[in-house]
Curated annotation (Swiss-Prot):
Organism: Caenorhabditis elegans
Name of the molecule in the record: Beta-catenin homolog sys-1
Cellular localisation: Nucleus; Cytoplasm; Cytoplasmic granule; Cytoplasm, Cytoskeleton, Microtubule organizing center, Centrosome
Further information: Exhibits low sequence similarity to canonical beta-catenins but displays functional and structural similarities so that it appears to be a highly divergent beta-catenin.
GO BP, one annotated term: gonad morphogenesis
Quaternary structure annotation from Swiss-Prot or TrEMBL: Interacts with TCF transcription factor pop-1 (via N-terminal region); interaction is direct.
Annotated effect of mutating residue 533 to L: Abolishes interactions with pop-1
Entry's Gene Ontology cellular component terms: cell cortex; centrosome; cytoplasm; kinetochore; nucleus
Keywords attached to this entry: Centromere, Chromosome, Cytoplasm, Cytoskeleton, Kinetochore, Nucleus, Transcription, Transcription regulation, Wnt signaling pathway
Amino acid sequence: MHSTGEPQRGPAGPYHHPMPYHVDQIPTTSHPSWHQAPHPGLPTPPYHPQQHPNYISMQPPPSQQQQMTPQALSTQQQQQVQQQQQRQLYSSPSPSRGPAAPAQNQKFRTEQWINNQAWPYSQSPAPPVAPSVMSYHQGDDRMSMLSVNTTMTNQFPDSQRCYSSNGSTCENVNPEMMQMNITQAAEQAIRLWFNTPDPMQRLHMAKTIRTWIRQDKFAQVDQANMPNCVQQILNIIYDGLKPQPVQLPISYYAQLWYNLLDILRRFTFLPIISPYIHQVVQMFCPRENGPQDFRELICNLISLNWQKDPHMKHCANQVFQIFNCIIMGVKNEKLRTEFAQHLKFEKLVGTLSEYFNPQVHPGMINPAIFIIFRFIISKDTRLKDYFIWNNNPHDQPPPPTGLIIKLNAVMIGSYRLIAGQNPETLPQNPELAHLIQVIIRTFDLLGLLLHDSDAIDGFVRSDGVGAITTVVQYPNNDLIRAGCKLLLQVSDAKALAKTPLENILPFLLRLIEIHPDDEVIYSGTGFLSNVVAHKQHVKDIAIRSNAIFLLHTIISKYPRLDELTDAPKRNRVCEIICNCLRTLNNFLMMWIPTPNGETKTAGPNEKQQVCKFIEIDILKKLMSCLSCEGMDTPGLLELRSTILRSFILLLRTPFVPKDGVLNVIDENRKENLIGHICAAYSWVFRQPNNTRTQSTKQQLVERTISLLLVLMEQCGAEKEVAQYSYSIDCPLNLLNGNQVKPTFIHNVLVVCDKILEHCPTRADIWTIDRPMLEGLTNHRNSDIAKAANSLLSRFPENDLLAGIFSNREYF
């Protein structure tokens, strides 16, 4: 009870047991000031313990230590101080014991202090009033012996009391009791922080609060008081990060700031703090716009200069972990936007950019720096352009001060450090793991930074593709995966047409061939597909490097889609096969005759490799991709459209034999290629309509009709197509629209005409828009008008008003 009679309360509610009248005294030998020597360089007045008032003063026999010479005693004390200073500055107390040293050390140091003070415990029986433990008084580190009547102040059972050999008791030496009092010590530290100017006491308070939170005692705080308690601790952290008015050694600040920053770091991920994480974010809000601003203090802690200091380096790492925890842990979009806005100020960006200077060793770069950059530029196009161009013209190579050039240097510099190291030593080599992480984060940041065609072209012009292919030579799966992903992103750059790829492309093809990772194969085949499009010299390089054989090998090694049960795996296989076929289509276009007569001649090796794509195994696999049902795969629509395109080009290629194509029967559906094409045609109309897939669906329908027409013309399959027409709706319904392409109109009319030629009964079943069809007979395109007249003649005349609409024209 307080002197006023009111119960004392802390952030956790009422204290667990009554406090002594003098509330500023907490008897405990577990306080850090008892177990740690005063910091060198700080004044330590020679405070002396107070003797018990009933103790009769008598001079004990001189102890062995008292008989030592002053010089020998001074030497012994210096050795003790040196031993205590050798303890690690950042060692954390055991969660089960709190901030105190082990019990045997407590007992030894207590007895040592007693012997040094010539306390006559060993020569007298236990007095009726036993001396209590030591404590700091009024927030400082002065030690005193409190005379306490144990019969009046025995607040705990005997199991929580520790007895000395002569029967006296030492209240708080018991570890269980120390755990009970850590909450009181933390509450008092929070309450007295701003009234305690003494630096050492502030350090002890910071350690006490940190220990209290580390031991999950913070969860005992009353929920009603939790917001206020969190804010009090955040205010303490803010105040503690400010420099003290007196000059203190940097090692002192390193200890103080490390403990305060560790408290803040724990606030960013503790589940009990998550409802109040907005209070942590508000700390980064601009306040004073001066050196005392919290953001300015944080920038000082992560300065590149501190990375060379063995003590302050730990504080900088704590700050980076705080940033990382907030960015990765906060899910509220409004709060994330607010935090990103707080971080967009010049000093922070400049401080972080210093780590990317060429003269900085890559081992000094914390991977969290890349995460911070990604966070602040993710939705800011203007900031991305500034980092890339520094207000220079976009049609020129990026300036040396831009982030692209710096990140390329980081990439190459890190690779040079890891090139000679054995990748198998990665689990035991933290330096190697750190450098690999730096390279991967560099790839990720570049992927976000290259947000438009100008940025991508600038990256390619600065030899970014060459840098990536150099780095991915190191045999690490994560590194190769990240590098190939970035290659895929820049693969459609216009600047690649002027980039020498004679050495780059063969290396990538070998990498795709030997690497087992699906992500690497997907990114590599995607890069190949884009880079050969509309670039004839790149096609020649790829063909000379056996790219066609590689495409066949990749498709052959994957199982059928209906044999894959894992949905992500199935979707990735869809995308890989699609990339391979798209690349093949770019090659086939060179050998198909065009109206202007520009056609390249394929060599014997190319002809042999292309013909492998109509072999039985490949045909069956591609047919199953067209017709397999019962799977929700996002990439299936694009894959089926690409397969249809591949069959169209293969059948139009002069040197590809067509005779045996329709003789291949799939085991599941017992149908040849025509049946699978009709299945894909019916499937596409069952897919939901949305703006993202609308164009792909229309493309699939157009390619279905085109392929059926090619089969009729190239393979003589008119009768077979007519027989399979029972499974599809009337294609004439596809012509109801104003945006239909003339080529598609002609193909639909011809296919329907051939179907009715071999199956006239279909005319009685199909429901058509006769006025629309009659209007097409007057189309300005003579081929369309001719096909419409031929088709119209196959339908019975059953509309007396048909002639009224016969003069309509479609353009």
